[in-house]
């Protein structure tokens, strides 16, 4: 449709002159985004995990587009050496996310670019919000933000409120090649099951759900802003324990959560965070540390800073998650 093409043109005209990296998988979402915003994209980033039969096909699609449009491209071939570096992360989705964002950061430094385009769409927004609500997550924001900072990069999601079907139709109408990820149909992944559930909703159900999510986000926005400022201060002070302990439990929860994320501890769960709040009681014992990952523990060091420390063998005490720190550590 010509009207649809005009819509994309109008969107592009509103963009600033900033230059971006673009994360492009080869699927319809990222290929549509790549074509819409190619004037603002300095470098395309593609990650090949070599975990599905169509992986090389998708890489070829992205490479061909970049050649035709004179766009520089950086490719990460994830081999066993790369996977070994992230072997401490059991969940593949969490591992893959960390691998690609570390890659984006590396390429950003290489080209001196701090902004990154990601092609999350409205379907992704709904699926994420659905899973968060189903888990009764304590997240202060349901869904996916249009812009945030990830691994030191400013991430923009320019097609977030465009549905996947519309993006695929855009590719078809503009004769842009794309690949379909065959694993999207596998029920072994929670997101795929959620996707099938939402696909059966009526337009009214989608509207009502979106309305409820936006209401939740608005109601929590003030506290979310306060937490964000508190964490900035916490980080600025090198994670001082005395700053942490002065906050109430609600703020402490998110200070720990963001600290663990910054330290690349994948998917810290609610029970772990609540246990850490109890561990960091007002009478903290500096001789003890709490396990947050295999052989990796959190503690208060001699400078009264909350930090991580590694151990291979330790004496487990009352709680199997807690160890007595060895002399000299």
Q: What is each stretch, according to the model?
A:
Residues 1-131, 165-166, 173:
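ATP-dependent adenylation/nucleotidyltransferase module used to activate substrates
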Residues 3-18, 148-150, 217-329:
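AMP-forming adenylation/ATP pyrophosphatase catalytic core
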Residues 35, 47, 78, 160, ...:
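Proline- and acidic/polar-enriched loop/turn elements at helix boundaries
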Residues 67-72, 98-102, 140-145, 203-206, ...:
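Glycine-rich loops and low-complexity Gly/Arg-rich segments
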Residues 119, 123-265:
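Flexible helical/loop "lid" subdomain adjacent to adenine-nucleotide binding pockets
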């Amino acid at each position: 449709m010509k009207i649809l093409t005009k819509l994309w043109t109008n969107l592009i005209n509103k963009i600033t002159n900033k230059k971006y990296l673009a994360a492009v998988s080869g699927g319809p979402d990222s290929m549509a985004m790549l074509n819409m915003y190619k004037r603002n994209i300095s470098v395309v980033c593609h990650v090949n995990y070599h975990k599905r039969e169509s992986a090389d096909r998708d890489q070829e699609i992205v490479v061909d587009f970049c050649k035709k449009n004179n766009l520089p491209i950086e490719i990460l071939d994830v081999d066993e050496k790369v996977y070994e570096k992230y072997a401490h992360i059991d969940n593949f989705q969490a591992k893959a996310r960390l691998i690609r964002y570390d890659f984006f950061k590396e390429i950003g430094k290489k080209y001196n670019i701090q902004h990154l385009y990601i092609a999350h769409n409205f379907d992704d927004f709904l699926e994420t919000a659905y899973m968060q609500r189903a888990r009764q997550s304590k997240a202060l924001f349901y869904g996916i933000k249009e812009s945030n900072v990830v691994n030191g990069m400013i991430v923009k999601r320019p097609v977030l409120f465009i549905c996947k079907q519309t993006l695929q139709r855009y590719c078809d109408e503009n004769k842009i090649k794309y690949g379909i990820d065959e694993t999207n149909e596998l029920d072994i992944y929670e997101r795929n099951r959620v996707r099938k559930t939402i696909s059966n909703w009526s337009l009214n159900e989608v509207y009502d759900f979106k309305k409820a999510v936006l209401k939740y986000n608005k109601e929590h926005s003030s506290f979310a802003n306060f937490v964000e400022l508190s964490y900035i201060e916490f980080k600025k002070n090198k994670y001082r324990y005395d700053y942490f302990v002065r906050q109430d439990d609600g703020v402490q929860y998110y200070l720990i959560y963001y600290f663990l994320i910054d330290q690349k501890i994948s998917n810290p769960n609610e029970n772990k965070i609540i246990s850490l709040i109890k561990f960091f009681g007002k009478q903290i014992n500096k001789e003890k540390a709490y396990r947050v990952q295999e052989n990796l523990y959190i503690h208060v060091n001699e400078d009264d800073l909350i930090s991580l420390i590694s151990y291979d063998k330790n004496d487990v005490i009352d709680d199997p998650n807690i160890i007595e720190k060895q002399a000299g550590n």
